[in-house]
Amino acid sequence: MATKNNPIASPEMMNAIRNDASDAYKAAVPLATASNLADVGNPILAYDAMANEFLSALVNKIVATILYRKMWNNPLSMLRKNAEPLGVDVEEAHVNPATAQAYDGTETGMAAVLKMTKPDVAAAWYRLNRQDKYPVTINNEQLTNAFVSWNALENLIQGIVDSLYNANTIDEFKYTKQLVVDAITDGKLKTVTAVMPNNEATGKQFQVQLRNMSMLFTFPSSTYNNYKLMGGTGNDRVTWSPIEDQLIIIRADVAANIGVEVLSAAFNLSYSDYLARQIIVDDLGADGKTLAVLADTKTFQIREKLRRFTTFYNGSAMNWNYWLHAWDTFSLSPFHNCVALRTA
């Protein structure tokens, strides 16, 4: 998706850093105007302590606060659940509907009042499985050149965003898609055969199949979740997904061939309501067979564990090393409906 292009580097940004800086920084660095960037930069470049304070504020506060202007928007980010800052495992429990028993008014039936009937419970555990770090180095020459003009300072900021934040966001997108691809490859995700919609007839056929699957999701069933495929033991798990809990991840070329109006009609939703449940992606695997994935929103168990900046100044080389650490859990739930539509 496109990103906003308003510049970040500005006198307002420099003064925001100054406002939160130490007294020594404020005494040495003048207020910024549109025409005095060099005067602002001179004391920052002259003293390591000033440079450290400036870069720390730039990376940790300014860029982190307003980086959305420069960020690529991950369309799959809506699948993320609440952060889990404690522990490395997350448990999800599923309780099957109780089994009906015939009424028995005899003494035998009355005796059963003290009998224990345990609920049919199954549990899945999701473990922390991503611990990435993204490095960027800013050397003295880069910092010096950044104070030549506002455009040069903007380029420095963009480099930080690209190296740290955008790299992380792009990887989050790839990891989420890979959940689906790996599950299909490993035989852990149910699939149905669908036709590639490349004309009016096949488009209608795809729409009917998608609508039928969506309606079937709303009924209690064990047919469309992946509990047994993912190694679950014991009884099948009965679940259902109301329309408002469903989403579709669909390839861009497939969505373009059908059109949003047709797809929204498949779900019996308005244009705007359907768009809120549609996620368009570039591909769903190298084999090119997966056209779309219809899923309950709870299928995707993606949780942020940690986002942290660390820094190190190398006085010998006169450069600053920054790392963005990103720890997450990426998993698919076995308990909720999820089916991939694939060509033969």
Which ranges hold each PLM region?
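Long, contiguous amphipathic alpha-helices that act as assembly "spine/axial" helices in icosahedral shell
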Residues: 119-189, 322-324
